[in-house]
Amino acid sequence: MTGRWETAPRAVRAAAVATVLVLAYGTVVHVVQLAVAGGDPYPDLPGWLRTYFLSLTVLDPLAALLLAGRRRSGVVLAVAVLVSDAVANGWANHVVDPTDGFTAGRVGHGLVTLVAVGLLVATPGLGRATASLSRLSTRR
């Protein structure tokens, strides 16, 4: 990944690497949940929410690969995935889950939300870095 990003500012490279690692971690989590649960990891969730979480087994690695390749589509997909994941986790942990107080899911939701906000803060820099590469590749 570093070769494609070597001309980007250090902070932007760090944000890109961190986002790729978060997306890779998300991929592992969703694949493990799918494997351990025998194909139905979220039986208590509404169908639309189960479908969304299952789709992350494809969307997380796709966003990571596109972002690692310094593609603007990777930035857009990573933002869409992480922001929607924060919203979906909020729904699952605060609307669907009737438990009062702190739960592991609610702590996880808070962490996903912090990561999504961090990515939103980094998005302008990531966007500029991917735009400059796009301009360079069209001039060749």
Write out the residue ranges for each language-model feature.
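Topology signature of small-to-medium multi-pass alpha-helical membrane proteins
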Residues: 1-140
